[in-house]
Amino acid sequence: MFRFALLLSLCLSLSATARAALVPVDMDTAAHLYQDAAIREQVRAALGSMPAHIRKLFQGNTSTALTDKQLDAINQAAVRAFRIDVFEAPALHAFADHLDADTVKKAEAFLASDAGKRMVAADLGLASLSDADADKVMNGDIAAVSTPQRAVLFEKLERAERSSESTVHILLTMGTAVALGTAVGSSMDPGPVEERARKSGESSRQAMEENLREPMRRYMAYGYRDLSDADLKHVLTFLQSTAGRQYISAYLASLGAGFYAMGRRCGERLGESLRELAMAQLATETAQREPPHTTPPDPVKPYK
């Protein structure tokens, strides 16, 4: 289910009260489930397109065209920040913090089932799609053969997973992280920057969620086209269970923490680079405004 446009299609986390009642599992246990779900492979497949997405993010938020040096700085910051080693440590910690022993046991049983294995394989297949093909799928230009019964199942799956809500949540979280990191790297006060990014995101959240619902259903239908109706029902049953809801809550928390860390790292590196470029530009402009340095003429010697 990965591509940047829908890095996650899993539900938002449970309430703080429910999380407080959990007895988190250890890191080794979480890492085993993380491996079973092929999270690393799916995230790694999404990272290659991140520099282009970050460039678009900045190009869409400026009224003046970015210079080649600024675009290069954005690209370099994204390449260095959006890496699996930056993602994995915070992601695994968050994953472990949102899991308990019963959830792990039932999630492992589901992932070991035929339907669970086919779901993971389908997720990996979606992760290998190019951005161009992913866009075509979400726009309906590429579609899987469907039936009214399957359409109903995918509508239920999208609602059960709250895929639109979670995708928007990740996009806004990462955007805020990049903005905050850029402020820190530029030696600006991060508080107002973070608040503006948060308010901007909240004002558009509902519209973004509604606009994503149908594209997300198309994406799921295409990715799971080789799963039978029985498989889809098995997946839906797990997702609607208590353990399933907790598992996808942990999955979302994991991805949210990992992408926040990468976004923050990207912003900090970018802020430093943009500050250096601005200082160099200011020095150049100052030098151009100053009158050229001339050597004073030799004093006239008195005539003897």
Model-derived segments and their meaning:
Residues 198, 206-304:
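A cross-kingdom marker for long, charged
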Residues 122, 127-135, 139-142, 146, ...:
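Outer-membrane beta-barrel domain signature
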Residues 21-131, 266, 289:
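N-terminal Sec/ER secretory leader and immediately downstream segment
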Residues 29-44, 132-178, 269-304:
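An acidic-aromatic pocket/loop used at catalytic or ligand-binding sites
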Residues 36-43, 75-82, 91-95, 106-109, ...:
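Second-shell loop/turn segments in exported
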Residues 5-15:
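Bacterial N-terminal signal peptides
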Residues 127-225:
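Extended amphipathic alpha-helical interaction segments
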